[in-house]
């Protein structure tokens, strides 16, 4: 189980970082950015994984949380981003497996929809990244995996 957690942690971090660099390649002005929490007291700021003009992109390889506080924090984060004049966009490459986590993702999608922020998950996330950047990261990673198969 520890090996699995280790793999998930680092593979996920790699995918999120690779996604940021795809966005940065297409849009050199892309940057990580913080907005003030104008809704609540904690945290004082929220990080935007990738800000490109008015697009505030949240990059997740997967979000398997089942914590109810997660919805509250995400709702506050999305509202603060919107109030700061940005469009919150979520791209999540892999959907969680557990029922409670799936329900939380459905709630988050509703929150994004409510502020006019797109929410892309699974294949839609890969497609969005390719359309937005012109870079087919899924294909690139598949090619790397194929080259290294059996090594």
For each feature predicted by the language model, list its residue ranges.
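Interdomain/boundary linker segments immediately adjacent to catalytic/signaling cores
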Residues: 1-27
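Active-site metal-binding core of divalent-cation-utilizing nuclease and nuclease-like domains
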Residues: 32-51
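Amphipathic coiled-coil/heptad-repeat helices and related helical stalk/stem segments
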Residues: 16, 43-44, 74
């Amino acid at each position: 189980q520890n090996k699995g957690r280790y793999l998930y942690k680092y593979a996920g971090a790699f995918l999120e970082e690779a996604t940021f660099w795809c966005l940065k390649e297409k849009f050199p002005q892309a940057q990580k950015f913080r907005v003030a929490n104008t809704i609540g007291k904690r945290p004082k700021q929220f990080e935007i994984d990738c800000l490109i003009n008015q697009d505030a992109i949240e990059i997740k390889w997967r979000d398997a949380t089942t914590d109810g506080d997660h919805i509250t924090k995400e709702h506050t984060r999305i509202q603060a981003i919107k109030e700061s004049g940005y469009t919150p966009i979520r791209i999540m490459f892999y959907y969680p497996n557990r029922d409670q986590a799936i329900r939380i993702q459905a709630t988050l999608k509703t929150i994004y929809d409510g502020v006019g922020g797109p929410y892309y998950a699974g294949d839609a996330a890969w497609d969005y990244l390719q359309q937005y950047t012109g870079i087919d990261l899924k294909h690139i990673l598949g090619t790397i995996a194929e080259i290294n198969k059996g090594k």
